[in-house]
């Protein structure tokens, strides 16, 4: 298994990531095509990366990371869309991605990795706790623009 950063767009990679995001979705619904421009923005940004875990020539997991900055926090890493293929869960791919995420955050000079996890996701919450993450008591808000 190898973990790399996305460095170029291809329709095949975009489709596989779309399949993985369906596995992540609570509803199991396909949210549609991921635009090529999104991939290009990630590839060209020094503050964002998409980590890809591959095994046997197939993408088995992804993690999308960003650096967030503020005067009170300085620099933190933020994790969005971390998923492994449901057919291979429990085989270490998520753990390998997790370690690579922590390394990525350290390389960027971040103090911590922050993320959200839905209330009904017991397996994901257990994974995070088993890997040293702690629940931080806060409310997460969203406002559509």
For the regions a protein language model found, what residue spans apply to each?
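Conserved active-site alpha-helix within GNAT-family acetyltransferase domains
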Residues: 95, 107, 119-143
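Acetyl-CoA-dependent GNAT
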Residues: 2-74, 99-100, 144
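A cytosolic small-molecule/anion-sensing beta-strand core signal
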Residues: 55, 80, 86
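Conserved GNAT acetyl-CoA-binding A-motif
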Residues: 98, 105-116
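A conserved beta-turn-beta hairpin within the catalytic core of GNAT-like acetyltransferases
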Residues: 68-79, 89, 136-137
